[in-house]
Amino acid sequence: MTADILEERKKSIISSDFCCQGDGSGISCEKESVSGAVSQRACVYCGARVVLNPITDAFHIIHGPIGCSSYTWDIRGSLTSGSDVFRNSFSTDLKERDIIFGGTKILEAAVDEVVAKHGAKLIFVYATCIVGVIGDDIEAVCRAATEKYKILVIPVKAPGFSGTKSQGYKLACDAIMKVIAPAYDGSKIPGSINILGDYNLSGEMWIIEGYLKKIGIKVNATITGDASMQTLQTASKASLNIVQCAGSSTYLAKRMEEEWGIPFIKVSFFGVEDTSNSILRVAQAVGNKEVIAKAEELTQTESAGLQSFLDKYKPRLVGKKAAIYVGGGFKAISLIRQFNELGIETVVVGTQTGQKEDYDIIRQLSNSGTIIMDDANPSELETFMKEKKADILVGGVKERPLAYKLGIAFCDHNHERKHALAGYEGVRNFVEEINLSINSPVWDLLD
């Protein structure tokens, strides 16, 4: 098991039975990637951009080379009910001369142009690796622009080398607080909630909102899927925050609790079990008896309606083996539960940004001998998928080529996908995709 693993990586790979080093100390996580390990993680800047990008009327100016802007251009498949300017990416396109002499003037001109041509009211300015090296003062530029135009121009100091993708999440959360805080007036909307950490991929936010509306809960603000500057500025009025993507938004929930007294709970709307539990927990947290009764009725009806559908596909999937490699721990946990419902054994599971408590739950849910990895690289994924004879890999766009090269089925569960996988509707889409991929006749041609 350890032959092809870098010595520095051994503590980040365990089995559900024992630690890879044999000392039983558990998994090493929440650390910077090992140099030379070819991590699948993205950079700090990317972490910040993916959280802020779905704000529908925000403008994003990337201060750096054009490649940084291209890398994250329209990176999430987020849908909008309003403006779609967020799908644009603006860059200062720094060249060698600008790196030598500084790019502050270019950034100032870029902000001026975005305001003049587009009437921007909210601008995020990102510092990339090059800017971190040459020391352009983006904070001063943003302060001057804010005073000049009387709009929000918010600096996001996110050089890729300054930490992990998780650090980018925190920087994005701090930027969101700068949008919300000026509108805080101490008032509350009783029984209302904010949804944090859902990015409205393929309209998933609207699915979740639909469930909550059916049971009588008002959604105050969504952060950041289908959000706008105006809706974000009402976020401090909510009575409860629910956190879907814990990795990217728990920090924001904690800040809102500390500063404005808004409690939060973590939820997951992936799979029948987690969707039902989340709806019930939200209803109980709101504390209204009528809401709780409606939640119980909704979850029972939806779960029962899916049973015949699941029974149809389960015989084709029982006994198959799955590998999981996703961004956050909450998604991996939900996927394991979904596979358990279908009779599929999870033999390999890893995340890019999972926390110790996530891995503890993953270990409890996993069968004996399951390989658990933090911040895995392609070589490790290949080694353990072949060793465990996985039939399908659930991951993102970077893992797709690896699966196909190994002759393994693949399911895209990352933010590039074009169909909803959340909620009860998402269960149908997920099971159908798993069945189509894992039972495709093409695999018979590879034997």
Model regions: which residues?
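An N-terminal assembly and electron-transfer interface module characteristic of large anaerobic redox
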Residues: M1-D447
